[in-house]
Amino acid sequence: MMRLTLKSKVLLLAMVPVLLFALVLSGGAVLILKKQADAEVKDTRERLLGDRRAELEHYVQIAMGSIQAEYDRSANGDLNARAEAIARLSKIKYGKDGYIFGYDSQVVRLFRGDSPVDVGKSFRDRRDPSGVYLNRELVEAGRNGSHYVTYTSPLPGNESVMVPKLSYTLYLPKWDMVIGSAINLDGVEAQLVEIKQDIDERIGTLIASIVGIAGVLLVVLLVIGLAVANAMLRPLHQIRQNLDDIAAGEGDLTRRLPVTSYDELGELAGSFNRFVEKIHGLVRQIAGMTGDLKQLVEQMSAQAERSEQAMERQRHETDQVATAINEMSAAAHEVAQSAQRAAEAAQQTDHEGQAAKRVVDGSIERIHALVDEIRDSGTSLDSLQQDVQSIVSVLGVIRSIAEQTNLLALNAAIEAARAGEAGRGFAVVADEVRALASRTQQSTQEIQGMIDRLQQGTNAAVDAMRRSGEAGEGTSNQANQAGDSLDAIAQLIATINAMNAQIASAAEEQTAVAEEINRSVHQIAGAVDSVADEAQQGAQTARSLAQLGQGLGRLVGQFRI
């Protein structure tokens, strides 16, 4: 498909009607002139043929006039008078080669000018080159009164050339003779050819005039069309230039088209200005929102970085808590073993106390041994009390960590709520961490209650050991009262056995609780790892948003607002 510019279309719109008008006018003029020429040629032909008919009739009438008197005086069938008339008619000549001829009703040639050729010969069955019985028609035209016959005949002196001819015949019934004459019409055709040539020249002159006028009009319309097209296309060129500037990266949205007319082009320029104004406002709003988005993304990125760091610290602290719980579990196990050994020692002491009743003499030494063992038990109980205090300290650390974890999870949930849809997964993880921290606090409180009871039992055991020591000292000084004291010692040993059983049970419970705490801490550590991974993903998402904001800022920066 041919691509034309708008200027070319405007010029074509101006020139094509003129060309069509010139073509239609030329064609109409040519058709009219052709019709007029044909009519003129026809009229001229008829006029010239009429002149030739009149001339030919005049010649024949002159010839008839030369024999009219004899014809009037003669009788029907008077061959002598006819012979005299033939002799007179054969001598008549006119023009360059004009002559008179005669045939009878049987188409027998009676004379042909002064030439004796074929005189007395019948031409009834003779045809011309066109196959027409010419001589019959000549005789028939004279007899029926039509007189005129048009035909073709070889040109005298050049038999190969056929020329049109016109004959006029007149029938003389008394003599049964048709006389007539013929003239060539080639002169008429020559005149007609000249007339046609003259008409063709006039038509050519007229067409040339029309073409010249059309050419002048085309030039004038071309100049006017160029001026109008330039005036029409100037705003369009400005619109295209502004659009090209915006598309090529210039991006100047402050430029406007001047509205210099109130036609469709002026309306187009006004519409373009309104369009650019709307885009200008949109780009300005996008630029402002891009700045706000950039600030929000930077804040979110900083918060994500802080959350990531906080979760890393919490992970480290959780590892420390797990280590402390493992140590506490080992200490509780040692306490249980010590309690078991104390129980065994108490039983042995009981046996020895029973033996002391039977063997008074060896009671002092055994009492001293018992005092030493009681002192060792007191020392072990002191160590147990110190271990319990360590467990209390560790539980305090665990409680503090749980509280800090709860606060961190709360802050993480708040930050996730601020992040909106992107922080929903992080908020779920933060809620799980808070739940785990709450459970840790509850377990810590339960352990604290157990340890309080363990401390009370330990204090009681320490007091009992102290009293046993004092009693042992008294027993060493008062060996005489050994029997009575042995009963008290037996009772005290039973109490010690019960306390040791309680200590062992408490130690076992402490071990179980420590293992439960250890599992909880490991779960917390796993949750913290998940939260840390989510925090890293949130930080990565924040960095991606920051990059998108920067890219959007660069895109908006391409426009001049």
UniProtKB/Swiss-Prot annotation:
SUPFAM superfamilies: Methyl-accepting chemotaxis protein (MCP) signaling domain
Knocked-out gene: effects: Mutant shows a dramatic reduction in chemotaxis for all ligands, but it does not affect response to casamino acids. Mutant showed no attraction to malate at any of the concentrations tested. Mutation does not affect plant root colonization.
Cytoplasmic domain ranges by topology: 1-11, 227-561
InterPro entries: Chemotax_Me-accpt_rcpt, HAMP_dom, MCPsignal_dom, sCache_2, T_SNARE_dom
Places the protein is found: Cell inner membrane
All residue ranges annotated as the HAMP domain in the record: 230-284
GO biological process: chemotaxis; positive chemotaxis; signal transduction
Membrane topology: Multi-pass membrane protein
Major location (coarse): membrane
Spans within the Periplasmic topological domain: 33-205
Keyword Transmembrane helix tagged: yes
Record-linked Pfam families: HAMP, MCPsignal, sCache_2
Family under the similarity heading: Belongs to the methyl-accepting chemotaxis (MCP) protein family.
Function: Chemotactic-signal transducers respond to changes in the concentration of attractants and repellents in the environment, transduce a signal from the outside to the inside of the cell, and facilitate sensory adaptation through the variation of the level of methylation. Directly recognizes five C4-dicarboxylic acids: L-malic, citramalic, citraconic, bromosuccinic and methylsuccinic acids.
Record's subunit section: Homodimer. The ligand-binding domain (LBD) is dimeric in the presence and the absence of ligands.
Protein name: Methyl-accepting chemotaxis protein CtpM
Lineage of source species: Bacteria, Pseudomonadati, Pseudomonadota, Gammaproteobacteria, Pseudomonadales
